[in-house]
């Protein structure tokens, strides 16, 4: 196992339970109280660094509204994060609070989501990611075809995230935040569950 210092640092900062309670209290009209769990996966899933990611509303702790798997890897242009769908999401429901559920997860259970990737850069103090160009991450929602635009910023103890569904023709925001990114604070560190690399 060989991982660059930057990829190792990004994975370490990403691993954890994040929450935006402070933001939800300050701006309740615009931001719900949300939990994000970014749980390290066994090295064997990708022969590299992967995470199971789960998002849920605080008032519905047993009903995650988003489950996915991501793979972090390096390209000549820097770090990239590729998204995958779970074939049986119900089997891993609430794994953010029971990481043992993820021990049996295998690559065969995952479906690559074409175009759903984020390119990451190091700014000197944090990592910033943005959807790869091309409007290729298609999401059907409420009878409308949209493309997913994502961006994030992550530091040692915070994670800011913006996801929007946009119209492919006009780029108008169809769903997602219109008031800026969700601002999460790390509540629990999961980096001890990352694979050991040399």
From Swiss-Prot:
Enzyme class per UniProt: lyase
Keywords attached to this entry: Lyase
Domain of life: Bacteria
CDD domains xref list: CpcT
Keyword Lyase: yes
GO molecular function: lyase activity
EC number, as in UniProt: 4.-.-.-
InterPro entries: CpcT/CpeT, CpcT/CpeT_sf
Pfam families: CpeT
Gene3D superfamilies referenced in this protein's UniProt entry, alphabetically: CpcT/CpeT domain (2.40.128.590)
Function, in words: Covalently attaches a chromophore to Cys residue(s) of phycobiliproteins.
Family: Belongs to the CpcT/CpeT biliprotein lyase family.
Name of the protein this chain belongs to: Chromophore lyase CpcT/CpeT 3
Provenance organism: Synechococcus sp. (strain JA-3-3Ab)
